[in-house]
């Protein structure tokens, strides 16, 4: 039987594409543009897994489709190659992280090329290349000049095992680090911060302008966390001190019965009484060991200590105790809250635990039993009594402003971005600190500030990065003799990935980040495909940098990525025992269609789970390509289900996709191809062109493949295949299975040219219309015959055809026809006697 020899055909076409630079980005200004972007990978030691190609295949199909439709297509690939794993590996093995990274990139590139992706490798970028990070550093100097990069003494998330501080976004809910799962403690350090908060409103508003999944937009909205309310100032009794709280419910001020400061609040030591000093100091120490996430966990037991001080509630003059508690964060809002326990669950639990007053100020509920958190008319609130929420907020804000004790205020949950890392393997921050106390940016003419090569990359132990040990690099002297010290912190991995999509547009420019005209031509990115796990971090940071560059006049668009698509996860085969615990695949045996634990004999349930080394269910694409071919892997991953769904890997599904490609190969190579069109496939062919064109455009790749299968089934029933339809079909399948597409194109045309730029097939709308229709003929209400007739025949024509039918004539022979009812396009009913 004829089959598709992938081991011969796939390498042949990969070599052809490379030799002929088939996928070099088009520059014909008269053509429309299409910029298809993948989230570039971190080149880990493990190489690609089968989850990577899912998104890559989707953008590749779109890119091939758009080339055939006459677009200039920019479809690049590169490497997000700085970051902790390479450094950790280097420290463990004594190898240079640059060498390790280069080896990993070579392996990734080999694997990617084996899958037949149509990348323009002339545009490859690598974030660790000094020619690339020169511009990462240049962007930093612009942020610094604009006052958007600054140093501050801030409590950071310190990870002792990693020897570095990490951003809030990199701390897991259990208070450990995202990388490595190490304990995170809070400690104050001098750090570089980026003022992303200055862009909070624009980052929020401009989400309306992009075509992104609503779930991702909501995650960004929640992270930015805009709230409108009021600042209220409380004086501390018997002192000249005061503190400000932000509240979204100033209308409940009459119900504020105590105040809480964050343990780190600057006022705590100044207002704590001698009696309470020891308890407060101990509580502050314990709070410093917890992460922000652990401190704000709603489920945890409420803890706190009274400072001994009282504040004055400005609206009624009542004295209220001032506490410290770790659920209030110094970094959020003002680091102080007014507590209204009658109407807030956390405040209510705290008040009950420490026996504090609970005064209801909204009608409804029983505040002795639980906090009443719904809306109601105001009570116990003097001039607000009887008002609803909106009216009461407006009136209270007016009163606060008139009395000079508060004002209307908009706040954001978003914090400034902690930008420095105490590690070696990252972009050096281009700042010099001089002995006279000033700091300056390294001038553009001296960029890139190259990361020095060193064997000693262990953390310095002082909280500084290993660069602090390299005195030759570290110490500088100005022309006027003033001595200086380079910044020893490096940038986080997020830096290089915040702008890489711009460098692809003009990757070899030595004079500027990218040429203005080229940026105008290619921006924004038309489709960006990657995992939903980057919803907040990378996507928010990239949007922030893009807006800064827009303000500088570097980029012409407000937003970088017009459309975002998150592919689902490919899950591995795994098994669960009766306790719900996952069992590694090497501990499972199959007997009579069921699965059992090899050691305990317990019957197991098959349950898809994330692929992991521990479960031994990771599928390596190299193995799949070797056994089934790259085209099979591509078609299978697109046919598994909707692209955004998470679906379990299946060997049977893979075999099904392989069989389909073999059938396609046989259809084109063994069926008689003719120049005469019998018309038998007119409808299904034109339906297939229409469906595949529309569904690829909408990224519904699974339904497009299903339609290709429909065509193959129909074509196999015919003795001959019309040449134009054979060619058109091969063009339709080529973006999904490009090696097979190229091979079959040569079988049909012997052109010697790639199929990549052959104009995409069009369909004939008139051939989609049914010209014939089946109608039923009933006699006395029972179906006696079915006729295939021309569409839209008149009643008379239908009647004549029905009465002329042999079966009908046999049924009515010797009977009187009372009447004939003909319904066009449906039926003929004959009443006889």
From Swiss-Prot:
**Organism the protein comes from:** Streptococcus agalactiae serotype V (strain ATCC BAA-611 / 2603 V/R)
Q: Which gene encodes it?
A: leuS
Q: Which family does it belong to?
A: Belongs to the class-I aminoacyl-tRNA synthetase family.
EC number(s) on record? 6.1.1.4
Q: Which Pfam families match?
A: Anticodon_1 (PF08264), tRNA-synt_1 (PF00133), tRNA-synt_1_2 (PF13603), tRNA-synt_1g (PF09334)
CDD domains in alphabetical order: Anticodon_Ia_Leu_BEm, LeuRS_core
Compartments, record wording: Cytoplasm
Record's keyword terms, sorted: Aminoacyl-tRNA synthetase, ATP-binding, Cytoplasm, Ligase, Nucleotide-binding, Protein biosynthesis
Name the residues that bind ATP: 613
**Principal location listed in the UniProt entry:** cytoplasm
Per the record, what is one GO cellular component? cytosol
'KMSKS' region, short sequence motif: residues: 610-614
Q: Identify this protein by name.
A: Leucine--tRNA ligase
Instruction: Report whether ATP-binding shows up as a keyword of the record.
Output: yes
UniProt catalytic activity: tRNA(Leu) + L-leucine + ATP = L-leucyl-tRNA(Leu) + AMP + diphosphate
Kindly state the positions of the motif 'HIGH' region in this protein. 41-52
Offer one example of a GO biological process linked to this entry: leucyl-tRNA aminoacylation
Q: What InterPro entries does the record tag this protein with? A: aa-tRNA-synth_I_CS, aa-tRNA-synth_Ia, Leu-tRNA-ligase, Leu_tRNA-synth_edit, M/V/L/I-tRNA-synth_anticd-bd, Methionyl/Leucyl_tRNA_Synth, Rossmann-like_a/b/a_fold, tRNAsynth_Ia_anticodon-bd
PANTHER family this protein is in? LEUCINE--TRNA LIGASE, MITOCHONDRIAL, LEUCYL-TRNA SYNTHETASE
Q: List the GO molecular function terms.
A: aminoacyl-tRNA deacylase activity; ATP binding; leucine-tRNA ligase activity
């Amino acid at each position: 039987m004829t089959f598709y020899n992938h081991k011969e055909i796939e390498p042949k076409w990969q070599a052809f594409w490379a030799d002929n630079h088939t996928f070099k980005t088009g520059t014909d200004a008269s053509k429309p543009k299409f910029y298809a972007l993948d989230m570039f990978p971190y080149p880990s030691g493990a190489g690609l897994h089968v989850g990577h190609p899912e998104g890559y295949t989707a953008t590749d199909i779109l890119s091939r489709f758009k080339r055939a439709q006459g677009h200039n297509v920019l479809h690049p690939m590169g490497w997000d190659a700085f970051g902790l794993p390479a450094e950790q590996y280097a420290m463990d093995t004594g190898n240079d992280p640059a060498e390790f990274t280069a080896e990993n990139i070579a392996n990734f590139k080999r694997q990617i090329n084996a899958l037949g992706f149509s990348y323009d490798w002339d545009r490859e970028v690598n974030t660790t290349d000094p020619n690339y990070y020169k511009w990462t550093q240049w962007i930093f100097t612009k942020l610094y000049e604009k006052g958007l990069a600054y140093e501050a003494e801030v409590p950071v998330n310190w990870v002792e095992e990693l020897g570095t501080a990490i951003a809030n976004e990199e701390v897991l809910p259990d208070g450990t680090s995202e990388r490595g799962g190490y304990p995170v403690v809070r400690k104050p350090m001098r750090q570089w911060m980026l003022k992303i908060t200055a862009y909070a409103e624009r980052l929020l508003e401009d989400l309306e302008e992009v075509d992104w999944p609503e779930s991702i937009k909501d995650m960004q909205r929640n992270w930015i966390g805009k709230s409108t309310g009021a600042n209220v100032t409380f004086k501390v009794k018997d002192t000249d001190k005061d503190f400000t709280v932000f509240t979204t419910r100033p209308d409940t001020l009459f119900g504020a019965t105590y105040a809480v400061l964050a343990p780190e609040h600057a006022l705590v030591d100044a207002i704590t009484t001698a009696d309470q000093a020891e308890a407060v100091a101990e509580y502050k120490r314990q709070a410093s060991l917890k992460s922000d996430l652990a401190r704000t966990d709603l489920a945890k037991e409420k803890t706190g200590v009274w400072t001994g001080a009282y504040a004055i509630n400005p609206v009624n003059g009542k004295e209220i105790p001032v506490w410290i508690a770790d659920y209030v964060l110094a970094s959020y809002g003002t680091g102080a809250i007014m507590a209204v326990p009658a109407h807030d669950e956390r405040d209510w639990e705290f008040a009950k635990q420490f026996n504090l007053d609970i005064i209801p100020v909204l009608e409804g509920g029983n505040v002795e039993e639980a906090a009443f958190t719904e809306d109601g008319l105001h009570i116990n609130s003097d001039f607000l009594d009887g008002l609803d929420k909106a009216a009461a907020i407006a009136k209270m804000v007016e009163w606060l402003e008139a009395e000079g004790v508060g004002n209307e205020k908009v706040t954001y949950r978003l914090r400034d971005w902690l930008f420095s890392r105490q590690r070696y393997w990252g972009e050096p921050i281009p700042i010099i600190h001089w002995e006279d106390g000033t700091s300056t940016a390294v001038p553009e003419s001296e960029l890139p500030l190259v990361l020095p090569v060193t064997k000693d990359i262990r953390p310095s132990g002082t909280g500084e990065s290993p660069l602090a040990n390299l005195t030759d690099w570290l110490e500088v002297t100005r022309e006027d003799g003033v001595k200086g010290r380079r910044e020893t912190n490096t940038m986080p991995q997020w830096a290089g990935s915040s702008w890489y999509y711009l460098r692809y547009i003009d990757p070899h420019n030595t004079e500027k980040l990218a040429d203005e005209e080229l940026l105008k031509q290619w921006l924004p990115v038309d489709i960006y495909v990657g995992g939903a796990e980057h919803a907040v971090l990378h996507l928010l940071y990239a949007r922030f940098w893009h807006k800064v560059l827009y303000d500088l006049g570097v980029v012409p668009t407000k937003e970088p990525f017009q459309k975002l698509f998150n592919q689902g996860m490919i899950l591995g085969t795994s098994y669960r025992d009766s306790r719900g615990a996952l069992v590694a695949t090497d501990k499972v045996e199959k007997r009579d269609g069921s699965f059992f634990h090899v050691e305990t004999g317990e019957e197991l349930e098959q349950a898809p789970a994330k692929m992991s080394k521990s479960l031994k269910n990771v599928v390596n694409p190299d193995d799949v390509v070797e056994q089934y071919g790259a085209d099979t892997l591509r078609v299978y991953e697109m046919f598994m289900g909707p692209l955004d769904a998470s679906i379990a890997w299946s060997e049977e599904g893979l075999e099904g996709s392989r069989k389909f490609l073999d059938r396609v190969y046989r259809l084109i190579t063994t069926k008689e191809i003719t120049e005469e069109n019998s018309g038998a496939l007119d409808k299904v062919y034109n339906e297939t062109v229409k469906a595949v064109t529309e569904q690829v455009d909408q990224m519904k790749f699974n339904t497009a493949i299903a339609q290709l299968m429909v065509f193959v089934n129909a074509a196999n029933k015919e003795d001959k295949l019309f040449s134009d339809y054979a060619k058109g079909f091969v063009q339709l399948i080529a973006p999904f299975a490009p090696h097979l597409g190229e091979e079959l194109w040569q079988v049909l045309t012997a052109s010697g040219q790639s199929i990549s730029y052959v104009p995409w097939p069009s369909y004939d709308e008139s051939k989609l219309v049914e010209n014939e229709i089946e109608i039923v003929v009933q006699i006395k209400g029972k179906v006696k015959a079915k006729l295939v007739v021309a569409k839209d025949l008149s009643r008379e024509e239908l009647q004549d055809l029905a009465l002329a039918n042999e079966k009908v004539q046999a049924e009515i022979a010797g009977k009187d026809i009372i009447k004939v009812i003909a319904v066009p396009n449906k039926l003929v009913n004959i009443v006889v006697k």
